[in-house]
UniProtKB/Swiss-Prot annotation:
Species whose genome carries this gene: Human parainfluenza 1 virus (strains A1426 / 86-315 / 62m-753)
The organism's place on the tree of life at top rank: Viruses
Highest classification ranks of the organism: Viruses, Riboviria, Orthornavirae, Negarnaviricota, Haploviricotina
Known role: The M protein has a crucial role in virus assembly and interacts with the RNP complex as well as with the viral membrane.
A single cellular component GO annotation: viral envelope
A single BP term in Gene Ontology: virion assembly
Keyword terms: Disulfide bond, Viral envelope protein, Viral matrix protein, Virion
UniProt record similarity statement: Belongs to the morbillivirus/respirovirus/rubulavirus M protein family.
Name of the gene: M
Disulfide bonds: C251-C295
Main location: virion
The protein's name in its UniProt record: Matrix protein
Localization in the cell: Virion
One MF annotation (Gene Ontology) recorded for this entry: structural constituent of virion
Length: 348
């Protein structure tokens, strides 16, 4: 059984909440576009800022009308039917304009979509009509982008392969950052296993303003009977000299010295941010690539949960440090479902 340490409430009280997107419709019964910006770190209050942008909207296909062959068919605008919802992450750039200018430029984008497959199902985005506010992102938009389908589409199986598909942007999520760099723990360091070490993981508990059961995300009841969601992230490992005994108090003392501050952002949907304002050991600092601010996008940790809650209100209710023995190197990781005898798979 693992030992835990609960961080004080003030560690996530200030920026541990994300407000919901207002899902309102206009006279045409279409969703009214909206932009939602949150701050992470210490971004400037005015002027130039570093902004990470995620576009949210609907996948649509042209409606099949009657083949009348009249001249009006050439002048009437094509109507579309929704076949799914999803997102398009366009990344970080230095932005000079206003929120409303950015929203207008995003909803004016003409985005065509194609569903394909490599080692897994993918969604290909091709972008046109890039206006001035989006010029800081123009290089990656013009090149086209491809993403794991399960990360950016709520139901990729609903996207037809024999029809034209467009992605209509309705909402824009933005994360205003204090730096142009979003630091993530490299996979090689996150998978690091050292002898005589303790793995420090964080159990993050959330309260979401949306019912998730019908979409396959089962909540957990807390002590008060409230429905909560949770996920885990790996912070790093604590290592002591051979022969030294790890006590719970020793681990807690290490964590308290870090003075961790937690916040929620909108990188890739919902993102969890950790900022160390205290002292870290050299071992832990090296695992965090010598960064004191780290981002954990839920899109990478739990894609399905992210898809379900990315438009809702989300609040951190608690964060616990979980102290567990590091997994020995001898343990084998099997990323594939099909394995023969000891897990070896013959590759073509």
């Amino acid at each position: 059984m693992a030992e835990t340490y609960r961080f004080p409430r003030f560690s996530h009280e200030e920026n541990g909440t994300v407000e919901p997107l207002p899902l309102k419709t206009g006279p045409d019964k279409k969703a009214i576009p909206h932009i939602r910006i949150v701050k992470v770190g210490d971004p400037p209050k005015h002027g130039v800022r570093y902004l990470d942008v995620l576009l949210l909207g609907f996948f649509e296909t042209p409606k099949q009308g009657p083949l009348s062959g009249s001249i009006s068919d050439l002048t009437e605008s094509t109507s579309y039917s929704i076949c799914g919802s999803g997102s398009l992450p366009i990344g970080i750039a230095k932005y000079y304009g206003t929120d409303q200018e950015l929203l207008k430029a995003c909803i004016d984008l003409k985005i065509t979509v194609r569903r394909t497959v490599r080692s897994g199902e993918m969604i290909v985005y091709m972008v046109d009509s890039i206006h001035a506010p989006l010029l800081p992102w123009s290089s990656r938009l013009r090149q086209g982008m491809i993403y794991n389908a399960n990360k950016v589409a709520l139901a990729p199986q609903c996207l037809p392969v024999d029809k034209d598909i467009r992605f209509r942007v309705v909402f824009v999520n933005g994360t205003s950052l204090g730096t142009i760099t979003i630091a993530k723990v490299p996979k090689t360091l996150a998978d690091l296993a050292l002898p005589n070490s303790i793995s420090v993981n964080l159990l993050v508990t959330l309260k979401a303003g949306v019912s998730t059961e019908q979409k396959g995300i089962l909540p957990v009841l807390d002590d008060d009977g409230e429905k909560k969601l949770n996920f885990m992230v790996h912070l790093g490992i604590i290592r002591r000299k051979v022969g030294k005994i790890y006590s719970v108090e020793y681990c807690k003392n290490k964590i308290e010295k870090m003075k961790l501050i937690f916040s929620l952002g909108l990188v890739g949907g919902i993102s969890f941010h950790v900022h160390a304002t205290g002292t870290l050991s050299k071992t832990l600092m090296s695992q965090l690539a010598w960064k004191k601010a780290v981002c954990y996008p839920l899109m990478d940790l739990n894609p399905h949960m992210n898809l379900v809650i990315w438009a809702a209100s989300v609040e951190i209710t608690s964060v616990d440090a979980v102290f567990q023995p590091a997994i020995p190197k001898e343990f084998r990781y099997y990323p594939n479902v099909v394995a023969k005898s000891i897990g070896k798979i013959r590759k073509i």
